[in-house]
């Protein structure tokens, strides 16, 4: 998310510095890259945000590819959601956007699909992008080509404001809030950030405008943000090229086929794990059982990688976008399962807001995902 925002700001002529504690922590290097607002079965404002971002993605990818001279691996391959019966299929939250499939339709779209699945929905408008191997690398190069500077290994410790406060002190929480909570008459403004560099030295960096895109770690810097980590484990297999033509989004497991036959399999959802690192036998077994149920033949494909990461989750699983609790601080975090999907529009919304060039409808979208909406 941080790279996407940095790139859009740089394209608008801003001078951008990215402070990154550890590049490998970014969820963009962990996610499967599904572009699935319909297959996920989400609703309301989050669905509308996802649909709008999905429409923006082809042009967004074209901008990244033009600036980086690298392919991003975008594939509008469609996604199939299987069900055990037609009643479940017809009651799915986003069924109106899909094509109903019976068993023969499932077998046509997903050759070799497991026998328990009797119905399905095909969302041809959904797809995937190869984020781990292509998109993130292209975004980094696009940022560099646009003049973005990077400080890898630099951890932001505090946000220092004009009131002499720091982000280490949580904001007071009222017992109740109205639908449109009042803002402070004279909110503190961002003046600087205190950071620790890779060599252990600490300094204050003057800064009047910043974007917090800290993912699952965002609340460590701003405790009033309702963002918690949800651990996810994944694995990949090497299958034959073309063996699986579409993404399969099953209950608890999804299969994402890359063009070269690599099959990305995800993902566990472990809110109880906190920031506990590492793979677990239980988590890997869950993925293997999901593979066997969805595409039995894939259980015999050679294993390639196993990894884990942390999703930034909010109480309603929607992102925190727009102005934050400190003047000059913007938020682009809390995207949970949909960070790759929502990156295109989230980056636009934040970059346009900071640049003072909002488009019609931006205010409504940002209002729906205010940090203090809960």
Model-predicted segments: where are they?
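N-terminal Rossmann-fold NAD(P) dinucleotide-binding loop
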Residues: 2-3
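Dinucleotide-binding Rossmann-like beta1-alpha1 core, especially the glycine-rich loop
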Residues: 34-112, 118, 290
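Helical element adjacent to the flavin cofactor pocket in flavoenzyme catalytic cores
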Residues: 122-163, 187-201, 205-209
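C-terminal catalytic lobe of FAD-dependent flavoproteins
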Residues: 132, 301-374
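Central helical "cap/lid" subdomain
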Residues: 197-249, 277-281, 297, 361
